[in-house]
Amino acid sequence: MPVMLIVRPSARAGDDMRTCSQAGWRARVLSPVEIEPDETALRGLKEQFSRADAAFWVSPTAVETAAPYVDFSDDLKAQIAVGQASGRALERCSAKNVSVPQEGNDSEAVLRLPVWDTLPPNARVLIVRGRGGRDFLAESLKKKGFAVEIAEVYFRRPNELNWQDFDAESIGAAFIASGELVRGLFAQVPPQFSRFFESLL
């Protein structure tokens, strides 16, 4: 069975592993970066969420990290997701009134959603994201007259990789989820594997 190397945080690799298995591949996960919940931010999230008229969810990780700390029973609150994966994550958490761009999965696509026109003037929008996310959406919403609050509910930490049992010859292909992970991976690649990883790019 061919092996697909998946480079992403281990908590996000489950769907990719299932996809590989269904396609007849065996998955091998390397996680040079891991996701850590920000416990301080999560303790204050319930209050932030309760006073918001709308919540914007930046990623499935944001949803899965924050959802246990909020109450989705208020169907009147608009839930806005950056893309289809985040929208599905919200629906799995029983969120209602979810708006998702049909094309695109970035802040620009989100800003084109009609849901913004349904919110009251000076509506309070909570952006739920990881630490250090883009400020483009927040600034754009402020220009539209919305009051924006940000909850940074997780952060990324470097993770030391174990190369002891790594078999480069068994890898048939690789999926690397982001540029950040490329940089984190290559910062740790041992000299004996550097040519192999360069050949994947």
Please place each PLM-identified region on the residue numbering:
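Signature of uroporphyrinogen-III synthase
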Residues: 1-201
